[in-house]
From Swiss-Prot:
<dbReference type="Pfam" id="PF00547">
    <property type="entry name" value="Urease_gamma"/>
</dbReference>
<dbReference type="GO" id="GO:0016151">
    <property type="term" value="F:nickel cation binding"/>
</dbReference>
<protein>
    <recommendedName>
        <fullName>Urease subunit gamma</fullName>
        <ecNumber>3.5.1.5</ecNumber>
    </recommendedName>
</protein>
<dbReference type="InterPro" id="IPR012010">
    <property type="entry name" value="Urease_gamma"/>
</dbReference>
<comment type="subunit">
    <text>Heterotrimer of UreA (gamma), UreB (beta) and UreC (alpha) subunits. Three heterotrimers associate to form the active enzyme.</text>
</comment>
<dbReference type="GO" id="GO:0009039">
    <property type="term" value="F:urease activity"/>
</dbReference>
<comment type="pathway">
    <text>Nitrogen metabolism; urea degradation; CO(2) and NH(3) from urea (urease route): step 1/1.</text>
</comment>
<comment type="similarity">
    <text>Belongs to the urease gamma subunit family.</text>
</comment>
<dbReference type="GO" id="GO:0005737">
    <property type="term" value="C:cytoplasm"/>
</dbReference>
<dbReference type="InterPro" id="IPR036463">
    <property type="entry name" value="Urease_gamma_sf"/>
</dbReference>
<dbReference type="InterPro" id="IPR002026">
    <property type="entry name" value="Urease_gamma/gamma-beta_su"/>
</dbReference>
<dbReference type="InterPro" id="IPR050069">
    <property type="entry name" value="Urease_subunit"/>
</dbReference>
<keyword id="KW-0378">Hydrolase</keyword>
<keyword id="KW-0963">Cytoplasm</keyword>
<dbReference type="GO" id="GO:0043419">
    <property type="term" value="P:urea catabolic process"/>
</dbReference>
Length: 100
């Protein structure tokens, strides 16, 4: 299977998000890369489902709470930007203050 660098990145984010979900199920708090991956995966999958950009920007800020991440992680993440493929093309989605 030959994958482009972008496809490899998408798979890596998806896999990291799966690990993050499993850790949350076990009650383990997420670190920085896991939190970013989970939010990014939410946006990418939402775009694939055809949800509008504005909806994903708002909903992306409710994927993870402060209680679900390690101390200091929420303060480290101000914005998450994800290039996602929508039915009408690729768009950059920015989730502001994603961990509240």
């Amino acid at each position: 299977m030959n994958l482009t660098p972008r496809e490899k990145d998408k798979l890596l984010i998806s896999m990291a998000a799966m690990v993050a979900r499993r850790r949350l199920e076990r009650g383990v708090k997420l670190n920085y890369p896991e939190a970013i991956a989970l939010i990014s995966d939410f946006v990418v999958e939402g775009a694939r489902d055809g949800r509008p950009v504005a909806e994903l920007m708002e909903a992306g800020a409710h994927v993870i709470t402060r209680d679900q991440v390690m101390e200091g992680i929420a303060e480290m993440i101000h914005d998450v930007q994800v290039e996602a493929t929508f039915p009408d093309g690729t768009k950059l989605v920015t989730v502001h203050e994603p961990i509240r």
